[in-house]
Regions:
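Accessory "access/gating" subregions that flank catalytic or transport cores
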Residues: 2-123
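C-terminal catalytic subdomain
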Residues: 105-214
Length: 214
């Protein structure tokens, strides 16, 4: 892609000190240290396209969303979420407390946020795929194909990735904002956490193929 490390500079990261953004830029600098490609194309462009120079600013929030979801789910997995819950009393008896620890909004919102983060991550990946295959910006053979008279090169991979991105956009719609009244209006609010978790699982599955395509 003939990019530059200018946008990954420590000074740029320091004035917007989100830890995951800083770490992402540091990772990119470390991976590309002493790269002959970087040296060869130094000054090739005034600045890179957003899908290249904004990687820390997108990958950082995605990492944060994953960490936040992990922290939330760790609490959920070590919680008592039944209803009612039975507690011992000091007199040796027990009491049943009716509550709503069974509500799945924590897991649901975490899962919905994951869907959005995954979709954003793959959105940028798809943009880079296009830059790799588009000869007008890559300065490489169209669709990375030297024999255009005989086949379409990697065009079909981009089609597949774009189709998967469309599915991710659908899955990025938050499940927890939906509601249906049930149980004779006793359960007049339903958190839809299961649907959100299922969407997150499906999104991760689709994302693997998009990132592999890139």
């Amino acid at each position: 892609l003939k990019g530059t490390l200018m946008a990954m500079a420590e000074r740029l990261m320091a004035v917007r000190p989100h830890p995951d953004q800083i770490n992402t830029a540091a990772n990119i600098r470390a991976i590309l240290k002493d790269s002959p490609m970087l040296e060869r194309y130094r000054g090739h462009r005034v600045q890179d396209a957003l899908s290249i120079r904004c990687m820390p600013q997108l990958h950082g929030p995605v990492k944060k969303a994953v960490k936040d979801a992990q922290a939330t789910l760790a609490i959920e997995l070590n919680s008592s979420v039944d209803n009612p819950l039975i507690f011992d009393e000091e007199d040796g008896g027990a009491v049943a407390l009716m509550g709503c620890n069974a509500d799945g909004t924590y897991a649901g919102m975490a899962s919905d946020n994951l869907c959005i983060a995954i979709t954003d991550l793959c959105k940028m990946s798809n943009s880079r795929i296009d830059r790799l295959l588009n000869s007008l910006v890559s300065e490489l053979p169209a669709f990375l194909n030297k024999n255009a008279d005989f086949n379409n090169g990697l065009m079909m991979i981009q089609y597949a990735s774009a189709g998967l991105q469309g599915e991710l956009r659908i899955l990025a719609h938050p499940a927890v904002v939906d509601n249906l009244t049930t149980c004779a209006n006793q359960e007049d609010y339903v958190n839809m956490g299961y649907n959100a978790a299922k969407k997150a699982y499906d999104s991760m599955h689709l994302a693997k193929y998009i990132l592999a395509a890139e």
